[in-house]
């Protein structure tokens, strides 16, 4: 049992970081233990906090509650719409100190940084192979299983890779998820 007092907040036994909130403390400790008690009943992916599994569920339900006021595009996550809004303003707030390249999306910037560090943050539990990019890692994982995690609600076609599933959705909606700005400017 974790004890605390007014003077002594919840303190991580692994790194000493202190928390005033029990929920934040328990979630933090899971970063050290690797415990992931929240499992998706659709695909089996596990998470260390309940809010993460609620956000993840949107992949399976197709829910996109965040709508861009400028163009009407819908997003699953609040962070995605914040990053998207930079495409309207042209703002690129994330700049690499190593090479000066700037990014609209913080996630693209974090991935770009790995070019300089060589960091490989994704490791396959099945074979131990490591990957720099999440897309390569997720594609690799499907080589170990025949399970398809993403199923189209319109036609039932299933995909093991989210990007392939997302591209397929355009067959039914007419949406083209990737737009070539060079081609668009030539028209």
Swiss-Prot record:
Start and end residues, zinc fingers (C2H2-type): 10-32, 38-60, 66-88, 94-116, 122-144, 150-172
MF-aspect GO terms: DNA-binding transcription factor activity; zinc ion binding
InterPro entries to which the protein is assigned, alphabetical: Znf_C2H2_sf, Znf_C2H2_type
Alphabetical list of Pfam families matching this protein: zf-C2H2
Any one Gene Ontology cellular component term annotated for this protein: nucleus
The keyword Zinc belongs to this UniProt entry's keyword annotation: yes
Keywords from the UniProt entry: Metal-binding, Repeat, Zinc, Zinc-finger
Signal peptide interval: none
GO BP term (any one): regulation of gene expression
Name of the protein described by the UniProt record: Putative zinc finger protein 833
């Amino acid at each position: 049992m974790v004890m605390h007092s007014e003077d002594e907040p919840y303190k991580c036994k692994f790194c000493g970081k202190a928390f005033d909130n029990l929920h934040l403390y328990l979630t933090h400790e899971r970063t050290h233990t690797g415990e992931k008690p929240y499992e998706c009943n659709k695909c089996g992916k596990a998470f260390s906090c309940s809010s993460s599994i609620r956000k993840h569920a949107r992949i399976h339900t197709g829910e996109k509650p965040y709508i861009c006021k400028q163009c009407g595009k819908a997003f699953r996550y609040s962070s995605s719409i914040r990053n998207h809004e930079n495409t309207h303003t042209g703002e690129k707030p994330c700049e690499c100190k190593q090479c000066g390249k700037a990014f609209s999306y913080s996630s693209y910037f974090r991935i770009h940084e790995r070019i300089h560090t060589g960091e490989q943050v994704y490791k396959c539990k099945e074979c131990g192979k490591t990957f720099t990019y999440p897309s390569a890692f997720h594609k690799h994982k499907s080589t170990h299983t025949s399970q398809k995690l993403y199923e189209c609600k319109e036609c039932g076609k299933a995909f093991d890779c989210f990007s392939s599933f997302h591209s397929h959705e355009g067959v039914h909606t007419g949406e083209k998820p990737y737009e070539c700005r060079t081609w668009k400017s030539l028209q």
